[in-house]
């Protein structure tokens, strides 16, 4: 093989930090008046007047090296929050200094809110609609902040103590933390921020249930399913309303609350859930599989682990590597065949994905030719052109639930009573994905209603599957959405959906 270079580990990156350094979190801070701490774009103005979590309300929490609860806060302008010798709160410095060190303490009322004590001054940080202040010797209502994690809500959950990933149990009524690698939809969790319920979090599973503190999954989210987020040396701890922390318990590593103190067993990281997909060959409508050995072959009628492949993007080559559950990569062999033999990502293990207007895609191999399906089902990189034997249909297997976001915000309803969707919301609606034929999917709301195209916009009011869509993977966390009629679902600056005829390059890429 060419270019035996870059081995890839399993760690996908702690996304609570938005892919910054480990232990750096990107957060919003909400005061007692339900307003976000804000760093205005001009004049280094500070206030607590933000209505929702947008760019100006984002803060990077950076750990210090001197204690797990001592942190720094950096604004979206890359300036550090600090308090001067006179008690003025500033955000103008490019560098950390003694006045920019804050100590986190957790409210004792069970709410999980944070108080931020400036280490050099000894006073607590508070906020008003006009400015930030640091004058309180003890924290009151104005000095307690609710923490809104700005990570993508759909994550893999990794235990720091056990060094294993969480997954849905076989019985689908518990979460077990014993997976070596996060494979399949069962390892995907949605960390739901509940602003109206004290800014706590619910852990939502792929089978549409919520984790109760007792370790069981249930359909309805109640008080026992809500947890506050705590920061411990760069890691996350989740505390229930009784003051006990989630951790893996026993030989099955069942995730439940038990301890009232935090050790490594109670700590977690939220990690990127890399896209995992299945492919159907256009020639025989069978799933591509490695079930029968090293040959990559389209010969299966159902999807299992051997028909699911993790797509890992090479940013320098702008191509994809496809990893199997046996930890091997698809690789172009000397004879042009595709075999799952490579344990490294090299040039012959990288493929370009080319999307077509009929919802199919093609793979271009390192030899410049397209993957074609032989009558036996075997894949060979021998096709000079894109014909039926070089077409495949794509399903995003480990996203049975989608959360979509664009530059304007999350996808959600215009108003609670209005079933039209907009894409400029501060909070999101989860979207259920139902697979149909030849890569087509139907999108469904929790109400049981389906997405329907209405003119150039989207309504969620169809009683049965109506309009289908194709999902096109463009980056590890971005997709384009194309209607059956070939138009892309686009986002306008005012937050409205619009079906566009724009080409592939200009289509809206939705973060998922």
From Swiss-Prot:
Fetch the Pfam families from UniProt. Answer: Fascin
Domain of life, source organism: Eukaryota
Provide a Gene Ontology MF annotation, just one. Answer: protein-macromolecule adaptor activity
Report keywords, A-Z: Actin-binding, Cytoplasm, Cytoskeleton, Developmental protein, Differentiation, Oogenesis
Subcellular location(s) per record: Cytoplasm, Cytoskeleton
User: Any keyword Metal-binding?
Assistant: no
Per the record, its GO cellular-component terms are: actin cytoskeleton; cytoplasm; neuron projection; neuronal cell body
A GO BP term here is: wound healing
Under InterPro entries, the record lists: Actin-crosslinking, Fascin, Fascin-like_dom, Fascin_metazoans
User: Where does this protein chiefly localize?
Assistant: cytoplasm
Described by its record, this protein's role is as follows: Acts as an actin bundling protein. May have a role in the asymmetric organization and/or movement of cytoplasmic components. It has a role in somatic cells during the formation of adult bristles and hairs, and in the female germline during oogenesis.
What protein family does this chain belong to?
Belongs to the fascin family.
- How does the record describe its quaternary structure? Interacts with Rab35, with stronger binding to the Rab35-GTP form compared to the Rab35-GDP form.
Name under which the protein is recorded: Protein singed
